[in-house]
From Swiss-Prot:
Protein name, entry field: HTH-type transcriptional repressor YetL
Lineage: Bacteria, Bacillati, Bacillota, Bacilli, Bacillales
Job of this protein: Negatively regulates yetM expression and its own expression. Binds specifically to corresponding single sites in the divergent yetL and yetM promoter regions, with higher affinity to the yetM region. Recognizes a 28-mer operator of double-stranded DNA that contains a palindromic sequence.
Subunit structure comment from the entry: Homodimer. The N- and C-terminal helices from both subunits stabilize YetL dimer via extensive intersubunit interactions.
GO MF terms held by the record: DNA binding; DNA-binding transcription factor activity
Keyword set, alphabetical order: DNA-binding, Repressor, Transcription, Transcription regulation
Induction remark: Partially autorepressed.
Signal peptide: none
PROSITE patterns noted in UniProt: HTH_MARR_1, HTH_MARR_2
Residue span(s) of domain HTH marR-type: 26-160
Activity regulation comment: Binding to the yetM cis sequence is clearly inhibited by kaempferol, morin, apigenin and luteolin, slightly inhibited by quercetin and galangin, but no inhibition is observed with the other flavonoids. Flavonoid binding may induce conformational changes and modulate interaction with DNA.
A biological process from GO: regulation of DNA-templated transcription
């Protein structure tokens, strides 16, 4: 596989001679992963938009779909989806407008709110998921279970190691 706009291995190895601590193979892999992650984000953004969703909205719907009683607090949704409370509010406003979620005040403490997946939201997911999962399977069909397991482990390790970029 050759990704566009990435330095060729030959050029990377030439820089390795100029700069200390450059492992050409690591740099090529890192740049390839960086490029493919941008491409995946772009593809998925358009995919979800074409279906009246966004990645964020889809994530919220799935969290609620999997939750006990299809209900979670806005704070829990923000935490589980790794976004701010302000971002979750915007996502929930959009999902409520679409009729996919509703806000429910607790009976004992009216300040507490839970977000519930509506019947319409559940039906939308049940209609959407088979095709979505089929597309994911098509993307991954050339990989063995062992390769998938190894890749998931490697991505987890990579995720942890990205902390070296935090200042």
């Amino acid at each position: 596989m050759e990704l566009k706009h990435l330095p060729k291995y030959k050029h990377i190895t030439e820089h390795a001679e100029t700069y200390a601590n450059i492992d050409a193979g690591s740099l090529e892999l890192f740049l390839s992963l960086f490029d493919i992650s941008k491409k995946m984000n772009h593809v998925m953004e358009h995919y979800f938009a074409g279906r009246g969703l966004s990645e964020g909205k889809f994530k919220i719907l799935m969290l609620l779909f999997d939750a006990k009683d299809h209900r979670l607090s806005p704070t829990e949704l923000a935490k589980r989806s790794n976004v701010t409370k302000a971002t979750i509010t915007g996502l929930l406003d959009g999902l409520a407008r679409d009729g996919f979620v509703s806000r429910r005040h607790h009976t004992e403490d009216k300040r507490k709110i839970s977000i519930e997946l509506t019947t319409e939201g559940k039906a939308r997911l049940e209609q959407f998921l088979p095709g979505h999962f089929s597309k994911i399977s098509a993307v991954m069909e050339n990989y063995s279970d062992e390769e998938k397991d190894m890749f998931v482990k490697m991505l987890g390790d990579l995720f942890e190691r990205l902390s070296v970029f935090k200042d």
